[in-house]
């Protein structure tokens, strides 16, 4: 099925141009790329991406069918119509300073293939018949460029696979079970911090401050859902979801703060080897585990003064929305950055992690002066 290139407008509210920004005034183009899924083995899938246009494109791999990380590339339904549990990672990538290695170049009429084993990120041990489909959005740059100039929505064909459960069960999981040898410290009986991973005092202080700021931002955002309808509609589109959005913000505030028991574990460092280039932090939703990466500390301020920019507080908020222990169903990465997040339908926005992080950051810039100081 073909992909329609969607070119969204820049926000008049955002101070800087983010790495995924799409310039205002660029018209909607013709269908330019095609994504086709095909079976390549028992649980192996091949995605073929074709550039139907007359000019070369640079396609950003992050959060797309081409992502080299074990992210959710397809939705999988079993024969009874139930979605198969995802056991991979949900990373938050840095928006800025995009490197050429983050892109795949596709010449006019050219194709690129990307294969992945769905058994490495899904429990297919029951075996049987499954239906797969991929949809998302690919940020685009010009040939040899790294400046995002557009984005292509894609909806693949449906792929039907008959999978041998025993063979699928023998495939090594991309992200194993988290093992801890050290103690856990619960912040006010909420999010547990894995102290074994937090031997660096500065990293522990930064994470503790980010959790406190996340609690404050989320609490204020929950109030603003009802108090500022214009802002709510900008991000979430439909008033019928206001209670759901407010409830999720309240749940994140509770998980981040000091009231009663919570269900996530937060790690200062990467124990599962998920911190590839460009990854700020990531979540394993099947285990309710969150991990910070080195650039979370080196490249992000505690809380940004710039509208819709990334920082430690809203990155932590973003990651907590990915955890089913915070609220179910947990959030996906349906649209990344302001332009892509605000272009989502209401149904997609209410389940999009960045919509919550951007709403909190974009609405509450005065919070930068209220950020809890590090201990």
From Swiss-Prot:
Cofactor comment text: Binds 1 zinc ion per subunit.
Enzyme Commission number: 3.4.24.39
Instruction: Give GO MF terms, alphabetically.
Output: metal ion binding; metalloendopeptidase activity
Does the record bear NADP in its keywords? no
**Chain positions listed as propeptide in the UniProt record:** 20-190
> What is one process in the GO biological process aspect for this record?
proteolysis
Q: Which cysteines are joined by disulfide bonds?
A: 198-268, 275-293
Please give the cofactor(s) recorded in the UniProt entry for this protein. Answer: Zn(2+)
Q: Which CDD domains is this protein grouped with?
A: M35_deuterolysin_like
Cellular component GO terms, alphabetical: extracellular region
Show which residues constitute the signal peptide.
Answer: 1-19
Q: Which reaction does it catalyse?
A: Preferential cleavage of bonds with hydrophobic residues in P1'. Also 3-Asn-|-Gln-4 and 8-Gly-|-Ser-9 bonds in insulin B chain
Localization in the cell: Secreted
Binding-site list for Zn(2+): 318, 322, 333
Kindly give the InterPro entries that the UniProt entry links to this protein.
Answer: Fungal_M35_metalloproteases, MetalloPept_cat_dom_sf, Peptidase_M35
Q: Where is the active site?
A: 319
Per the UniProt record, one Pfam family is Peptidase_M35
**What UniProt keywords are attached to this protein's entry?**
Cleavage on pair of basic residues, Disulfide bond, Hydrolase, Metal-binding, Metalloprotease, Protease, Secreted, Signal, Virulence, Zinc, Zymogen
Whether Hydrolase counts among this entry's keywords is yes
Q: Which family does it belong to?
A: Belongs to the peptidase M35 family.
Biological role: Secreted metalloproteinase that allows assimilation of proteinaceous substrates. Shows high activities on basic nuclear substrates such as histone and protamine. May be involved in virulence.
Name the UniProt record assigns to this protein: Neutral protease 2 homolog MGYG_00813
